[in-house]
Amino acid sequence: MSSREYDDLSHAFAGAGGGLLSMTLTYPLVTLTTHAQTMVRLKKNEEEEKENSNEDGSLSPKSSNTSNISQKKISQFEILKKILKDQGAKGLYNGLESALFGIAVTNFVYYYFYELTGKTLSRRSNPQTTSGSKKVTLKKGLSVWQSMAAGAVAGTISRVATNPIWVANTRMTILSKNQGKLGKLNTIEAIIYILKNEGWQKLFTGIVPALFLVLNPIIQYTIFEQLKSFIVKIKKRNVTPVDALLLGAFGKLIATIITYPYITLRSRMHVKSMTENNEDSEKERTDSVQSLPEDGSDEDNSKENPYAETINKIISKLPSPIVSMFIIGYKMYKEEGVSSFYRGLSVKLLQSILNAAFLFYFKEELLILSDAIIKSTKRVTGLANNPYNAKDVIHSFEKALCMRNPRSRTTTVPQTNEE
C-alpha cells in the first residue's frame, strides 16, 4: 500500500473490481463446493423415487429430475464428472452472473463501510489527526479491536443488503437445470420471481447463518491488518500487492476453517426454502423441536432428561429463522454426522484461498486507478476539497438547482456560505 491517502469510495470500487476478477477465476470451485454442501438432500429425494419405482413400477429412476449420483460417499471428482456429463462445461458456471453481481455489491458495500468505520475509529483514538485535515493514513493498520469493530459493521451491512442475491445465486447454481424457468432468469428476474411466488421472507432465508458468517471477514481482516502492521514495523516499508496476496490467503484460510459449518448451513437453508412447502416446514419444525432433547428416542427419555421441557420452551420462543437453522444443523448431525458440516471443505479452502489472494492482489492494483477516477470526478463536481458524503452531494444538487432556478438562488447561497 502506498503512503498516499485513498478515498473510501476508491477502496469500494477497487474491492468490487477485485471481487469480479477473483470470482470469475475461481467460480468452478464455488460450483463444486455448493453442490457438495447440498448434494445429500438431492440424493435422499432420488432414493425415495427409486423405492417408489421398485414398489409399483410407476416411476423410472431415469425420469427423475433430481440428481442420480450413487448412494455411496460422493467425492469431489464424482461431482465434477456428474456436472460435466449432465450439463457440460457450462454447468460449472451456473449462476455466474448472479455471483458476479453479488460479489460486486458485497465487496463495494463491505470495503466502503470498512474504510469509513476504520477511519472514524482512528480519528477518535487519535484526536490530533483531526486538526487541519480530516484524512487519516491507515498504512500502519488498525488495532485488533478496531479491525474487529470495522469488520463487524461492514460485514453486517453487506450481508443483510446482499442476502437476496445469494439466495438467487444458490438456487441458480444448484437447480438451474432442474428448475426450468428459474434457471433461465438473470439475477434481478430471479429475485422478482422468488418474491412473487414465495414472498419476501424467502429472499432472507439463511440470514441467521449469514450474520454468523460476519465472523469470517472479521477474522480474515483482523489477521490481515495485524500482519500488515508487522510487515510495516519490521521491514520498514509499505505492503505490496504480492504481500497483500499472501496475507489475504493466510487470513482466509483461518477464517474459512472456523466458519465453514455456517457456510454449509446457509447453503442447505437456501435450497430447503424451495424444496419444501410451508406446511411441511412447519410440521418438521414442530416434530423436530419435540425430538431434539429426547435424542430421537421414546417418551421415557424425556422423563430421564429434566431439562427437556425447559429446552423445548426456549426453542419454541426463538425466532423462526434461528429455530430453522438449529433444526437443520441438528438433523445434519444426527443423520449424517459431524463430517456433514465440513462436506466440500477441501475444495472450499482451495477456492477461498485463491479467491482471497486474487482479491487482495487485484484490489491493490486497481486502487490507484480507482482513486484517480474518483478524485477526477470530485474535481469536476466541485467536491475535491471535501469528503465524499451525503451532505456534499445535497449541496451540489442545491447549487445546480440554483443555477437553473434564479428565484431560489438568494435563499440557498447564504446557507452554504454560513457553513
From Swiss-Prot:
Keyword Amino-acid biosynthesis: no
SUPFAM superfamilies xref list: Mitochondrial carrier
Topological relation to the membrane, as annotated: Multi-pass membrane protein
Solcar repeat start-end pairs: 6-120, 142-230, 239-369
Entry superkingdom: Eukaryota
GO molecular function, one term: ADP transmembrane transporter activity
Region (Disordered): 44-69, 274-305
Sorted UniProt keywords: Membrane, Peroxisome, Repeat, Transmembrane, Transmembrane helix, Transport
GO cellular component: peroxisomal membrane
Coiled-coil blocks: none
Biased composition (Basic and acidic residues): 44-53
Primary subcellular site in the record, as a coarse category: membrane
Subcellular location: Peroxisome membrane
Record flagged with keyword Ion transport: no
Membrane-traversing stretches: 12-32, 98-118, 204-224, 245-265, 310-330, 349-369
Biased composition range(s): Polar residues: 56-69
Family, per entry: Belongs to the mitochondrial carrier (TC 2.A.29) family.
Biological role stated in the UniProt entry: May have transport activity.
Record remark on domains: Lacks a typical peroxisomal sorting signal.
Full protein name: Peroxisomal membrane protein PMP47B
